[in-house]
Amino acid sequence: MNYGKKSPQLWAAIENEEQRQQDTIELIASENIVSDAVREAQGSVLTNKYAEGYPNKRYYGGCEFIDQVEQLAIDYAKKLFNAAYVNVQPHSGSQANMAVYQALLKPGDVILGMGMDAGGHLTHGATVNFSGKLYKTYGYGLNPDTEELDYDEIMALAKKVKPQLIVAGASAYSRIIDWQAFRKIADEVGAYLMVDMAHIAGLVATGTHPSPLPIADVVTTTTHKTLRGPRGGMILSKSTELGRKINSAVFPGIQGGPLEHVIAGKAQAFYEDLQPEYAEYIQQVVKNAQAMEKVFNTSKQIRVVSGKTENHLLVLDLTKTGLTGKDAQNLLDRVHITTNKEAIPNDPRSPFITSGLRIGTPAITSRGFKEEDAQKVAELISTALTNPTDEERLQEVAKGVHELTTKYPLN
């Protein structure tokens, strides 16, 4: 009987990935390193259990302990964000956004969200995404001079297109977002305001970024990224009335059985996020990003979009290096620094090529990196990107990476 026999090929790949993570400086802004406790929760016997429905309202028997797990996740999240309503069942951030759209809109309604070339997400209205196929979507951009959100321009666009829903939030924007300005715009045109805080949820939880919870109608987030939890989604609101609509949109609207082993991982992560040391971690995340910003701002060839960061990430304009974002990503992969290509504002190149890079500090901060380490990483990146064909310099960069990953092991 081979029940439980491990696949050698599968486990070799898993072990290789673990070694890759150990040997690599991870700068993808949406990635982080979960605790052993989160991994244990995800690998628990909860993966065996089906539990359609919600706590104390299940369609299956034997859910008494599952109910406890899911309720803990809800209660921890409510406390973490001071929310009246929480749904922890969405399988991803995209599923969370889809559920909100289904709860509040009908097909063909107008959504106004941040354009992808300005730092928005696929689910904020991209034509290739369900959001752009089911709804009529428009994208707002950035002020071309400051590369920051221009709330007057967004107001003018909202008055023109008359959206039923405005989406605030971004996947590649390094500045503080003014939720009250978005509330004013939404009220002016009679639209719902949804905030997608997937990237900055950890900053919101600790007060490092202003909270949208008292201001927005609905807030969505992922549970990984800065929250340092398992991959998944969550929906929050100050309104329990809207919450009832959203619950129906999640189940039975777009999902069946929830992934209770992942929800257990979410509960464990939220518990960790409620501890005092988590706020210290988030503060260090921002300090590390700002330490990297200082290095890049001294470069003659690498430009920080908008000139600074106020959160966990930076977008780098590589135009003067002669490298595309794809070139730079591949080059840095060679020296064991993982990043992702990113469009810069009004990027002339395709999303598959781009003219920029997005880098973030959550994962390196989880490993223990401080400001001086983050500065060293930025210097290594600058050396590589400005000497892309100098093998000797690239070997020096790889050596510097190895020194840092050895100094700060993954576990």
Curated annotation (Swiss-Prot):
State the Gene Ontology terms under molecular function.
glycine hydroxymethyltransferase activity; pyridoxal phosphate binding
Q: What is the lineage of its organism?
A: Bacteria, Bacillati, Bacillota, Bacilli, Lactobacillales
Q: Which organism is it from?
A: Limosilactobacillus reuteri (strain DSM 20016) (Lactobacillus reuteri)
Q: Which UniProt keywords apply?
A: Amino-acid biosynthesis, Cytoplasm, One-carbon metabolism, Pyridoxal phosphate, Transferase
The job of this chain, per UniProt, is described as:
Catalyzes the reversible interconversion of serine and glycine with tetrahydrofolate (THF) serving as the one-carbon carrier. This reaction serves as the major source of one-carbon groups required for the biosynthesis of purines, thymidylate, methionine, and other important biomolecules. Also exhibits THF-independent aldolase activity toward beta-hydroxyamino acids, producing glycine and aldehydes, via a retro-aldol mechanism.
Q: Tell me which residues bind (6S)-5,6,7,8-tetrahydrofolate.
A: G120, H121, L122, S350, P351, F352
Q: Which reaction does it catalyse?
A: (6R)-5,10-methylene-5,6,7,8-tetrahydrofolate + glycine + H2O = (6S)-5,6,7,8-tetrahydrofolate + L-serine
The keyword Membrane appears for this protein: no
Provide the protein name.
Answer: Serine hydroxymethyltransferase
Site residues, Plays an important role in substrate specificity: H224
Q: In which pathway does it act?
A: One-carbon metabolism; tetrahydrofolate interconversion; Amino-acid biosynthesis; glycine biosynthesis; glycine from L-serine: step 1/1
Q: Which cofactor does it need?
A: pyridoxal 5'-phosphate
Q: Please, which domain of life does this record's source organism belong to?
A: Bacteria
Its subcellular locations are: Cytoplasm
One GO cellular-component annotation of the UniProt record comes to: cytosol
Q: Which residues carry this modification: N6-(pyridoxal phosphate)lysine?
A: K225
Q: Which family does it belong to?
A: Belongs to the SHMT family.
- Principal subcellular localization: cytoplasm
EC code(s) of this entry: 2.1.2.1
Q: What class of enzyme is it?
A: transferase
Any GO BP annotation: tetrahydrofolate interconversion
Subunit composition?
Homodimer.
Checking Pfam families in the record gives: SHMT (PF00464)
